[in-house]
Curated annotation (Swiss-Prot):
EC number(s) reported in the record: 1.1.1.-
Family statement drawn from the similarity comment of this UniProt entry: Belongs to the short-chain dehydrogenases/reductases (SDR) family.
PANTHER family documented for this protein: DEHYDROGENASE_REDUCTASE FAMILY PROTEIN, PUTATIVE (AFU_ORTHOLOGUE AFUA_3G08550)-RELATED, RETINOL DEHYDROGENASE
Other comment: The macrophorins cluster contains a single gene insertion (encoding for the terpene cyclase macJ) compared with the yanuthone cluster that produces the linear compound yanuthone.
An annotated Gene Ontology molecular function: oxidoreductase activity
Keywords associated with the record: NADP, Oxidoreductase
Record flagged with keyword Oxidoreductase: yes
Protein name, as recorded: Short chain dehydrogenase macD
The keyword Oxidoreductase is annotated on this UniProt entry: yes
Residues the record lists as binding NADP(+): 57, 86, 113, 204, 208
UniProt record, GO biological process: terpenoid biosynthetic process
Gene: macD
Pathway given in the UniProt record: Secondary metabolite biosynthesis; terpenoid biosynthesis
UniProt function note: Short chain dehydrogenase; part of the gene cluster that mediates the biosynthesis of macrophorins, isoprenoid epoxycyclohexenones containing cyclized drimane moieties. The first step of the pathway is the synthesis of 6-methylsalicylic acid (6-MSA) by the polyketide synthase macA. 6-MSA is then converted to m-cresol by the decarboxylase macB. The cytochrome P450 monooxygenase macC then catalyzes the oxidation of m-cresol to toluquinol.
Length: 330
């Protein structure tokens, strides 16, 4: 049941200071990614890496951020670096990871924000459904590429690195349960690539289900003294994600957003709460807004547990063909 009015969300607590910290945020040139970047800089982050698909747009954002009066007041000389990252492309993920490892000594916080929600099945260069490629596969590869690097940074600093992944409570109502269930003996990844398994208004949530299942599998394999991983849902936020919809649907969604959607600033608070405020208690947890939530009924069901197990095995097999897996992913 969707609440008509979303709960009130409080601002971030006072006293957060990011002096000396380096943060990477994907999808940083628009929407919540850009807003979270602004907030990070106002919190005096020393270095912020804008990981973006369109470098020219990213550089324009960086220029605007440097000229922002509120940022200048709190953080007059931050390092704002733009790096190309197209999460629709495995090769771009690998190039970005290599550049990051070579150019940035330590990353303290990695925010996985980039995402899309398409209403028809499109293919990425990998052959996978594009929504799932962007929201799931490429983020898993990015984690695999950067995990040893993040762990090494934690050893240097004496504090755990953070991975905060933007998820969605839409994963709780999945087409995999009734509308497009996985058949006995069918692979999870193969199923997600089938035309007949693509349920337009549920594919975004289905892709986010894979994300949260992967996190639930990964977290117990990580030492939270070295890396804390969590996932959050900011709820409905007034961003341009609905721009991909056909005009008639966009008009309807925009009407709903006009009375229900949160300001983008609030979405930024929710992202940064997971990345900066909550501690080890959030490791391997999904947060609705700022509240740690239980696993969904489907994930806890026997069918959900079987999918989660198969998903891990199949994903690791695929990612293992692209990169040398860290021990935690073997």
């Amino acid at each position: 049941m969707v609440n008509i009015i979303q709960p009130k969300v409080d601002p971030l607590p006072t006293g957060i200071g990011l002096t000396g910290k380096t943060v990477v945020i994907t999808g940083a040139s628009a929407g919540m990614g850009l807003e979270a970047t602004k907030q990070l800089l106002r919190l005096r982050a020393s270095t912020v890496i804008l990981a973006v698909r369109n470098v020219a747009k990213g550089e324009a954002c960086a220029t605007s951020l440097r000229q922002d009066r509120r940022i200048q007041t709190h953080n007059p000389k931050p390092t704002i670096k733009v790096m190309e990252l197209d999460v629709d492309d495995y090769h771009s993920v690998q190039r970005f990871s290599k550049q990051l490892r070579e150019e940035i000594p330590v990353v303290h916080i990695l925010i996985l924000n980039a995402g899309i929600g398409l209403l028809k099945l499109e293919r990425s260069a990998s052959g996978h459904d594009r929504t799932t490629q962007v929201n799931y596969y490429s983020n898993v590869l990015l984690i695999a590429e950067l995990l040893p690097y993040l762990q090494a940074g934690a050893e240097k600093t004496g504090s755990p690195a953070r991975i905060s992944w933007v998820g969605s409570r839409a994963h709780e109502v999945t087409s995999l349960e009734k509308k497009a269930p996985i058949k006995p003996g069918e692979g999870v990844l193969a199923h997600m690539d089938k035309e007949e398994a693509f349920v337009p208004f549920q594919r975004y949530g289905d892709s986010k289900l894979l994300c949260v299942m992967f996190m639930y599998n990964l977290a117990p394999r990580l030492d939270p003294k070295k890396v804390i991983i969590n996932m959050m849902c900011p709820g409905m936020v007034n961003t341009n994600m609905s721009d991909v919809l056909p005009m008639h649907l966009r008009l309807i969604v925009n009407v709903v957003k006009s009375f229900r959607a949160r300001p983008v600033e609030v979405g930024g608070w929710i992202i940064l709460n997971s990345a900066l405020v909550v501690g080890p208690e959030s490791h391997g947890k999904f947060l609705n807004d700022k509240t740690i939530s239980d696993k969904s009924a489907f994930i806890k069901s026997p069918a959900g547990q079987e999918i989660q197990k198969k998903l891990w095995e199949e994903t690791i097999n695929e990612i293992g063909t692209l990169t040398t897996l860290p021990a935690e992913l073997k």
